[in-house]
């Protein structure tokens, strides 16, 4: 997705790789401190509209999944919230709990670990609820229709890999992700098995490229190289 954010890359995702298949998806959660009066995403949006430019959210850095999720929320709702980029997830946690920011995008493992009793998740960035935290609504359910800032992991091969080899790799990937023990292990890490065909994987990448290009159109944020 870096290319969609204006970063010049030495490769082309479609030309320089053979796309084998989508493997996993994962989500972030928009969270506030446990003592925050806001109980819903709608309340946060209302507050942000009442106080433009005064609410800030912590992300794991410019161009990170948290930054993308925050910018998508900003563009889809018209609110003015400020991204405060930190160097990784641990700094994001410290910033939120230390009251440096009002909001943060954090992982499921954070909420089920250090965040227990200290953070309050308001919405999950995926289009579907996270099976590990099923009581947290999606952004769409919370009032932002069409919102989806899930991120994914996929398998790629060198360019010009023979189609028969790509098909075999895809088959093996599907078999591995169908294993219940593997799926359960992944779920504890906030990862959801989402195998696809090479063609479906191509569509996912292209759709994501266009979405993030639209989201960041006109932005001057310097994305990490």
Residue ranges and their predicted role:
Residues 29, 102-103, 121:
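Short, Asp-centered acidic motifs that coordinate Mg2+ and/or phosphate
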Residues 71-76, 90-101, 112-118, 205-208:
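Short helices/loops that flank or line small-molecule/ion binding pockets
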Residues 86, 105-106, 124, 196:
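Short beta-strand and adjacent tight-turn residues that come in two discontinuous sequence segments
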Residues 8-10, 14, 25, 110-177, ...:
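C-terminal lobe and pocket-closing loops
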Residues 76-77, 163-225:
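An extracytoplasmic/periplasmic, membrane-proximal ligand-sensing/linker region
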Residues 4-91, 139, 152-185:
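Hinge/capping helix and adjacent helix->loop/strand transition within the periplasmic-binding protein
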